[in-house]
Amino acid sequence: DFLFARTMIGVFKNIEYMCSRTSSKTWGKDAWKKIVVCVISDGRAKINPRTRAVLAGLGCYQDGIAKQQVNGKDVTAHIYEYTTQVGLELKGGQVSLKPRTGCPVQMIFCLKEKNQKKINSHRWFFQAFGRVLDPNICVLLDAGTRXGKDSIYHLWKXFDVDPMCGGACGEIKVMXSHGKKLLNPLVAG
């Protein structure tokens, strides 16, 4: 739940940043309407119950609705959709909900019935949601990755400036909290 919340907080801050770009032709106060956050979880039995609780708090998951079969046919995935105005906060390793002061966030949560690994989740995103949403760009983040407040904007900007750009990546930095020193020089460098 902590890693998931850290990622979502970074995504929320990026959406707020895009909404704050009032002189932009693309973004501005209604930028949130152009952004959909898709969360894909790999396996109903595998999802962390605390992460499930965070998703429920955001409004994009309801416990007790998912079934393994419907009318005798196996279910592949469960899809929840919600525009949330709930924010997240990290305090001492705990995740708490708070009212969002920024713009709303459109969310889709896909809970796959079976654990079929990361590449299958990527395929789900591109083949299922990509076809329906028809996005101009997609940014994939693993749980635990915290994007800087404007990182996603800068990734988008690379595509906007060069329409022939087929891919872009951001920089990943090691996070050391509260002045702790890394003892492994291979990781610290």
From Swiss-Prot:
GO terms for cellular component? cell septum; plasma membrane
Stored Pfam families:
Chitin_synth_1
Q: Which GO terms describe its molecular function?
A: chitin synthase activity
Q: Which InterPro entries match?
A: Chitin_synth, Chitin_synth_fun
User: Would the keyword Transferase be found if you checked this record's keyword annotation?
Assistant: yes
Family named by the database record: Belongs to the chitin synthase family. Class I subfamily.
Q: What is this protein called?
A: Chitin synthase 1
- What is the native source organism of this protein? Aspergillus niger
